[in-house]
Amino acid sequence: MTETRTYATGKRKTAVARVFLSPGTGNIKVNQRPADDYFVRETSRMVMRQSLELLELLDQFDVSATVVGGGHSAQAEAMRHGIARALCELDPERRPSLKRAGFLTRDARKKERKKYGQPGARKRFQYSKR
């Protein structure tokens, strides 16, 4: 018995999602918990499901993911990225539509570090001319 289970990694900010995709009924688990329990905000749930909804495959795959780091929003986007990559690995013909929607693009924006001699990354201390 060979189970067709596909693995992919999705990232966003400091969140990393290890996503396992297998044929099923649309059951989504995040860190061994149902996705609806893990993601409290409806927008996070919507973001996470976007790549499956785009291809109308929401009820054809079971998703199991382990997510670490970042906040809930970044974790949801990391899952979306991972699910999209796993779907491409299963069927390369899905790639153009996922790429067009921007789900395969790694969002490289991260928090800019604080610099010494100033209170934040960009903010400067008040300057007095006189």
Curated annotation (Swiss-Prot):
Keyword list, A-Z: Ribonucleoprotein, Ribosomal protein
Matching SUPFAM superfamilies: Ribosomal protein S5 domain 2-like
Chain spans, region Disordered: 98-130
Pfam families, alphabetized: Ribosomal_S9
Keyword Chaperone appears in the UniProt entry: no
InterPro entries per UniProt: Ribosomal_Su5_D2-typ_SF, Ribosomal_uS9, Ribosomal_uS9_bac/plastid, Ribosomal_uS9_CS, Ribsml_uS5_D2-typ_fold_subgr
Disulfide bonds: none
Gene3D superfamilies with a match to the protein in the record: 3.30.230.10
Ranges of Basic residues composition bias in the record: 111-130
GO molecular function: RNA binding; structural constituent of ribosome
GO cellular component, as recorded: cytoplasm; small ribosomal subunit
GO annotation terms (biological process): translation
Top-rank taxon: Bacteria
Similarity-based family: Belongs to the universal ribosomal protein uS9 family.
Cross-referenced NCBIfam families: PRK00132.1 (NF001099)
Name of this chain's protein: Small ribosomal subunit protein uS9
Biological classification of the source: Bacteria, Pseudomonadati, Myxococcota, Polyangia, Polyangiales
